[in-house]
Amino acid sequence: FSCSWAKLSVLAPLVDTLPFPFNEEIKGIADVSGLPLGEVMFFNVFYEIFTVCTSLVAEDTTGKLYHARNLDFGLFLGWDIKKHSWEIPEYLRPLTVNLDFQRNNKTIFKSTNFAGYVGMLTGMRPGIFTLTMNERFNIDGGYIGIIEWILGKRDGFWMSFLTRSVLENATSYAQAKDQLTNTKMLAPAYFILGGNRSGEGCVITRSRKACLDVWELDLKHGSWYVLETNYDRWKDPLFLDNRRTPAMKCLNETTQKKISLPAIYDVLSTKPVLNKLTTYTTLMEVSSGTFEAYLRDCPDPCIPW
């Protein structure tokens, strides 16, 4: 999509400051697509500050782990009065793709992504772990990290680049958890991580420089799922944006005995968990390698977020 309201050419020089291979991939996308380099750079940056999501990991009574997410994007970035929808999700739905990353003709990981975007927000290493990233709104947020990067302070990882790096290189749940917990980042985030053994599921709450909390599955005490929207679990969500309570209510009513991917899809289809910002839903089951994504549209009556 075109952002004529911004002079995006000023972002083009920043591409060379990005780590390899992301810088070269962005240049390649610009060359092949014919889009200005600054516009492709912007397309790869603004996910650091505008993503609103719901992610969960759940374990059934047999020890099978499920991981799913709604990706909601484009809050306050333009409302289409005629279609009664946000403009950005309308642009992004046709760009949504499922990718299979291979090395030596062997699948390393799978991801739901947007064409032209080199970072990762949702992915699975089949048989090993699943991973989603949700934005964490904070005063010391993504804007600050990006400004510091522009000014030359570049000692942190871009969130989506870290997610991709973990999907590419981590070979176990424990290794992925360690990298997501300890790597310095440009923006605060929630990483929702699922493994391949009973009890392996957590929400990692991150500031830009530290890990603030790791909320883990705890079956002995009845915690058979973890669920994250965009608020710290020890705080109440904003009353205008409470997706957490309805989602948890649906999960509790479903029960651990009856949890499954179709049941989780139904949970993520419940309003306001499903809303006008929802672009796609991804369902993952690590042991079988099941990886499914669905484009979403919330029919009226439906809340904006």
Predicted regions: what they are:
Residues 1-53, 58, 167-305:
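C-terminus-biased signal that marks the final domain/tail of proteins
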Residues 6-7, 156-160:
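Gly-rich Lys/Arg/Thr-decorated short loops/hinges at beta-loop-alpha junctions or inter-strand turns
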Residues 16-158, 186-188, 258, 279, ...:
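A contiguous strand-loop segment
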Residues 69-71, 113-114, 133-137, 162, ...:
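Short, structured patches in soluble enzyme cores that scaffold and shape functional sites
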Residues 152, 161-167:
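Short histidine-centered catalytic/ligand-binding loop motif
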Residues 159-162, 172:
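Internal, well-ordered alpha-helical segments in soluble enzyme and binding-protein domains
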